[in-house]
Amino acid sequence: MLSYRHSFHAGNHADVLKHIVQSLILNSLQQKEKPFIYHDTHSGVGRYDLTHEWSEKTGEYKQGIARVWQQDNIPAELDSYLDAIRQLNQGETLRYYPGSPRVARAHLREQDRMVLTELHPSDYPLLEQEFHRDRQVSIYKEDGFARLKASLPPQERRGLVLIDPPYEQAKEYGDVVRAIAHSYKRWATGIYAIWYPVVNRCDIDDMLEGLQGLEIRKILQIELGVAPDTNERGMTASGMIVINPPWTLESQMQTILPFLKQAIAPATGHYKVEWVVPE
């Protein structure tokens, strides 16, 4: 199924959480001179116009990045994330929102590179156009899990793999677990960040149980919710499961999440940072 279009959801609370975690991990990789690789399994188009009719139709960004953007006393931990957004916009006007490839590109140094994968026939050409002639970027029109399997281990010992399928089908939760099982065997030194939506909590519990069964150490769960779990249709929260997280990530998110809750959903918001599997 290829019906999912992220343009409807760009800049929502789930994007904010995902891209903050992504930025913090990439910041940590910048601390050493040796090159790193960034691998994105479901890349989208790279950037999103928040004035587009699809974005305006849902208005999800208005309850996400727009609320963060207008805050005072923003934690310093968000600087590089917000810098990636500013690179696409002039002044303080918020029109364009970076997808994960653009967030990553803002963190690459000359010695680093990234691999992007997008299968959607409408999104792939836009992604290719976004990074036209960028020698540090490789783009593939194929299944994200298949490309990841073929790409590991990379020549770099360090790097980040972002796995964020649309979860249109229930089997994708199992696909994630299988992808991690294979990838970790091939590249145990990499950092893996898995994004997930909380629509049905049972799906998340099953995925976490599957990951715990892989006997991998150091698995951190980060979650931000805007409403309590419900059996009704719709996403009430989202999270990131990070394997081999930087040692600073837990404390950074403990600072950031209370700010995000207050900015985005002060009355109904909730969050957590906890170890699924400790070191």
Language model features by range: what are they?
Residues M1-E279:
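Class I S-adenosyl-L-methionine-dependent methyltransferase catalytic core
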